[in-house]
Structures are given as structure tokens and as C-alpha cells.
């Protein structure tokens, strides 16, 4: 079975439970699902950069705490708690027998992983609690996955100019443009059907911004993997690699999507 078929089969298997969780799993079921994804991603992230079980499990634990702070505490308090948690993590990773440079590198990587994975993913349970939050999350997923899919096919068919050859040689400018166009088109179409009270222009803008955030997240994860010297973050999902490989764009889009869902009423959107 080739890679494309594996990717399609994996997507078909995962799509129904994902849709069910978004549409019918508000509250703790949805938060638990996203938290599970955060833990899996954190496990892959810390396995890429740290060799000892102590550092890996400590990183996963801090990421989990950051995620819990993000979903349980009021917004400002959550920010302060996240900073405290990251500071404690940094102190933990600074301790050890390695050289000061290595320990400082470890502390920085731990703080980055905890905030990027745990903090960014914590915005999804917050988003689903907003008015029409489940539909906004689906808009984000449509924009991200449409952009990812079309960027792949457009890039393979028409791609000539490398987008970032030192980070991800396979990505092209043409693929990125095609992916962004797909994010806008499919996101706008989705909004017309499921967010009829929101201004179409705002939905198109939201789809574009989320699509760009998703592409940035994809490139950022490619940068992390290149820095770690690995091709995939893991082997959990056939055809995709690891969980972090599959949701890299979703992670980056989380805070942007949350902000857009908050701003929708101010832009005349009722959801």
C-alpha cells in the first residue's frame, strides 16, 4: 500500500470520531480528547530532542500542566500560571551534569514544547465553549485540512519554486498558494452553510488567516524535525508519521481560530 492510500485510510478511520467529538462532545469529553492529543504530541516532541526518560516524561508532564492551566483557569490567570509552569520547567531542565550550553538548550526546548503544544491546544476547549464554537472549530479544521490537501496535490502537479528549501525541500510556492486558495474557497463555502449569521467577508478572512497559520505550523514542525535530525515525529499514524506530524497545522491555528471566534460578534456575526 503506497503512502497516499495509507494517508487516506487513516483519515477515513479518524474522521468520524473527530466529528463526533466536536459536534457532540462539548465540555470534558472534548477537553479530554484534545488533552490526549497534546500528550501524544508532547511525547513525540520530547523524544525528538531528549535522550533520557527523565527529561522526556518531565516534558510531557509540564505540557500536560500547561494544557490544564489553559482550560481550567480564567484567561489572565491561565497566562500567569503557564508562565510559572514554564519557569519551573526551565529550572528543572537547567539542572543536570551536561554542559551549561546543553542544559540551556534543553530548558529552551522544553519551554517551547510546553507552550506551543500544551498552550496552543488549550485554546480549542475554550473555542468550543463560545457561541457556535463547535462550528468555528469545524471551520478551522476545514480550512486547515483543505489547505494541506490541496497544497500537496497542487505542489506535486505544478510546483516549481521551492518555498523553503532548507527547511522543507518538498514544499513549493505554487503548492502554498493553491493550499491557501483552497482554504479560502472551502472555508467560505462551509461558512455559507453552517455559519449563515456571520458576514461572508469575515468568514473568508478567517479562512485565509487560519489557512496561513496552518501552513506556518507545518513549516515550523518541519524546522523542528530538521533540527532534531528526524524524518517523522513518530510512527503512530500510517502514512502520516506521528500525531505531531498530523496536527502540526491544527496546533498553530488554535490561538488564531479562538481570537477570530471571539471577534465574530464584533464583526456582525451571530454564528
What are these regions (language model features)?
Residues 227-250:
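Interfacial loop-to-transmembrane junctions
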Residues 156-157, 225-227, 251, 256:
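Re-entrant/interfacial helical elements at transmembrane boundaries that shape
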